[in-house]
């Protein structure tokens, strides 16, 4: 009789554990599918906001939400918000396609000096990736969000295709005039935040950038070799890397300073 009871209890326990496992499995995949659907539905709008010509901001407690490209004087706008907000700004939640280099460097310096963290909500490309992202105390990369590099003022002359304000140019005389000072400023900034100035260049030097945008990114290990640390991923690095593969964003590798 005792043996029969033990067998019954064992069977019930196995069935219970099996039911819990099946429920957990379906719940996980349901949540993941729901998240993926919501991501796809919101993706177009979020990207559009990140590429807006004019930057927009709003505050929620200690988080400053920033959307749109970086233009001249945006550093002054952000500085005023940060300095005058009663609650100290702890995090900047960014969604930006990049923009004006000098302004981005100034914003990066503000982030570094204030010890502000950054959350990449969807896009942090070009000058946003070059200067805002590495300057932050902590870096949080959301699901499917891109930290994309495609060069800097210190790119090889043959690959230097954008001016300080983001306007494309191929005139060597113009490039030399515009970039002579900004190249120095670029290196001084990286020296200040203890990050290698080669970070934006390695993917470009490997010629592995996305065919349409020239963008590439790095995994956590390569970021750390440049000096970019304290990175976390909302869904883990492996899930994030898979999302980059799906979107066709290649991973560059660490390279040493010239």
Predicted ranges, named:
Residues 157-254:
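Charged, glycine-interspersed solvent-exposed loop segments at helix/strand-loop junctions
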Residues 75-79, 104-108, 112, 130, ...:
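Extracytoplasmic/secreted envelope proteins and their assembly/folding machinery
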Residues 87-103, 117-123:
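Short, glycine-/small-residue-enriched flexible loop/hinge segments at domain edges that mediate gating
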Residues 57-68, 91, 163-171:
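Acidic/histidine-rich, surface-exposed loop or edge segments in extracytoplasmic proteins
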Residues 35-77:
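STAS-typified acidic loop motif
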Residues 8-23:
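Hydrophobic membrane-insertion alpha-helices, especially the h-region
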Residues 112, 116-156:
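Glycine-rich beta-to-alpha active-site loop
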């Amino acid at each position: 009789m005792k043996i029969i009871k033990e067998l019954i209890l064992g069977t019930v326990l196995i069935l219970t554990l099996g039911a819990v496992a099946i429920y957990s499995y379906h719940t996980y995949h349901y949540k993941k599918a729901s998240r993926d659907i919501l991501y796809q539905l919101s993706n177009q709008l979020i990207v559009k906001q990140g590429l807006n010509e004019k930057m927009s901001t709003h505050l929620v407690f200690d988080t400053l939400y920033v959307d749109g490209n970086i233009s001249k004087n945006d550093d002054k706008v952000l500085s005023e918000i940060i300095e005058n907000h009663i609650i100290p700004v702890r995090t900047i939640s960014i969604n930006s396609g990049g923009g004006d280099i000098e302004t981005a460097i100034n914003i990066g310096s503000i982030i570094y000096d204030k010890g502000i963290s950054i959350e990449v909500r969807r896009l942090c490309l070009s000058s946003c990736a070059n200067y805002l992202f590495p300057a932050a105390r902590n870096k949080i990369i959301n699901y499917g969000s891109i930290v994309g590099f495609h060069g800097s003022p210190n790119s090889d002359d043959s690959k230097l295709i954008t001016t300080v304000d983001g306007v494309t140019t191929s005139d060597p005389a113009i490039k030399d005039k515009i970039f002579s000072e900004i190249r120095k400023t670029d290196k001084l900034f990286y020296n200040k935040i203890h990050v290698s100035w080669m970070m934006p260049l390695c993917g470009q030097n490997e010629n592995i950038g996305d065919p349409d945008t020239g963008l590439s990114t790095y995994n956590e290990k390569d970021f750390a070799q440049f000096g970019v640390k304290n990175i976390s991923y909302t869904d883990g690095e492996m899930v994030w890397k898979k999302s980059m593969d799906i979107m066709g964003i290649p991973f560059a590798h660490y390279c040493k300073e010239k």
